[in-house]
């Protein structure tokens, strides 16, 4: 009976150890995924700001060109 008791405790102990190792690995994987998501978000934010700046520059140039065309048309009359 003592042999079975020791065996059972050993199995339970090893099960708990392996479970804690699995949970630790799972946490590490989640941390890595979160870090990758953060990096991707930063890249998207950087890309979006560049697109936004390019759009502003294009609108400014188009506005100046339209204003110049209108002033030329008014000047011709």
From Swiss-Prot:
Chain residue ranges for the region called Disordered: 24-46
Keywords recorded for this protein, A-Z: Amidation, Amphibian defense peptide, Antibiotic, Antimicrobial, Cleavage on pair of basic residues, Secreted, Signal
Valine amide, modified sites: 74
Short name of one Pfam family: DD_K
A Gene Ontology BP annotation from the UniProt entry: defense response to bacterium
InterPro entries registered for this protein in UniProt: Dermaseptin_dom, Frog_antimicrobial_propeptide, FSAP
Tissue specificity as recorded in UniProt: Expressed by the skin glands.
A GO CC term attached to the entry: extracellular region
Signal peptide (residue range): 1-22
Propeptide: 23-43, 76-77
UniProt family annotation: Belongs to the frog skin active peptide (FSAP) family. Dermaseptin subfamily.
Name of protein: Dermaseptin-B8
Organism taxonomic ancestry: Eukaryota, Metazoa, Chordata, Craniata, Vertebrata
Gene responsible for this protein: DRG2
């Amino acid at each position: 009976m003592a042999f079975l008791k020791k065996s059972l405790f050993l199995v339970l102990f090893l099960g708990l150890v392996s479970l804690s190792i699995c949970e630790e690995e799972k946490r590490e994987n989640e941390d890595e995924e979160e870090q990758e998501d953060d990096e991707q978000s930063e890249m998207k934010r950087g890309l979006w700001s560049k697109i936004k700046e390019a759009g502003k520059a294009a609108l400014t140039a188009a506005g100046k060109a339209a204003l110049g065309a209108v002033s030329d048309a008014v000047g011709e009359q």
